[in-house]
Design a protein with these regions (language model features):
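Secretory targeting signatures
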Residues: 1-39
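Short, flexible coil/linker elements and helix-boundary hinge sites characteristic
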Residues: 1-4, 30, 75, 110-114, ...
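Solvent-exposed, well-ordered amphipathic alpha-helical segments
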Residues: 1-12, 165-169, 209, 215
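Short extracytoplasmic/periplasmic juxtamembrane "stem" segments immediately C-terminal to an N-terminal membrane anchor
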Residues: 39-56
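Extracytoplasmic/secreted envelope proteins and their assembly/folding machinery
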Residues: 40, 103-106, 207-211
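Surface-exposed amphipathic alpha-helical segments
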Residues: 47, 169-217
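Intrinsic disorder/low-complexity segments enriched in polar/charged and small flexible residues
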Residues: 49, 68, 161, 190-193
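Conserved polar/disulfide-associated segments of primarily extracytoplasmic proteins
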Residues: 53-167, 176-179
Length: 217
């Protein structure tokens, strides 16, 4: 009789443990909602979101999620864009790991003819308009897909948002020459819009810098 009672207790404990696990999983799933980072309309000016570039996905049964928005300046002579990607993973990566992933993504741009000048690399940290400390990497390079080749500048900037529990990766790209029409002097007006901040990041003072104002919570 003793052993029979012990067997019943074991089964009861197993059922209770299973119920607890199910509750924990469902609690995590419902709390694992992705807060999608975006650029507020009030700072976009003549920039607009490219709806066709909007993307996102769930992986690992919804335990990892991501969403991405792309904004363009709608200028054919000096094209520029900013992509804002939000990631909610089972475990939040470090900022250093995020930056490494971003550098890998920038390096893959060579498949589209974007050749980065490795000697031009600039790394650092700054605080955005919502007081998140970000890490960034900046390159100058060439867009060899254009004829003639055009000069470009590109930034990858990342941070973790503790409030929303998500990670944010921003990539900003700007063509700064117009060799097609004989304008080889750098035109940084769209680059300034991408990287500008109240504190004068890279010498560009602006309340409406796009990456500086990305809202993630």
């Amino acid at each position: 009789m003793f052993f029979k009672g012990e067997g019943k207790n074991s089964r009861l404990y197993a059922i209770i443990a299973l119920i607890v696990v199910i509750i924990i999983v469902f609690t995590f799933l419902f709390s694992n909602q992705l807060t999608k980072a975006y650029i507020p309309d009030k700072v976009l000016s003549f920039w607009t979101e490219d709806i066709e570039e909007r993307s996102g996905s769930d992986t690992l049964f919804g335990l990892e999620k991501w969403a991405s928005f792309t904004y363009r300046n709608n200028n054919e002579t000096y094209p520029a864009y900013v992509t804002v990607t939000s990631i909610k993973a089972l475990f939040m990566p470090s900022e250093a790991d995020l930056l490494d992933k971003t550098i890998e993504a920038l390096d893959k741009a060579k498949e589209d003819g974007i050749i980065l000048d490795e000697s031009s690399i600039l790394r650092g940290k700054r605080k955005n308009n919502f007081n998140h400390e970000s890490m960034f990497v900046i390159y100058t390079g060439n867009d060899t897909s254009k004829d003639p080749v055009e000069k470009i500048k590109i930034i990858g900037e990342t941070w973790n948002c503790v409030v929303s529990g998500s990670s944010v990766i921003c990539i900003g790209f700007a063509q700064i020459t117009d060799n097609l029409h004989g304008n080889s002097e750098p035109n940084l007006i769209h680059w300034e819009k991408i990287v500008g901040s109240k504190t004068g990041f890279l010498g560009f003072i602006s309340d409406n810098g796009l990456i500086y104002n990305v809202k993630c919570h």
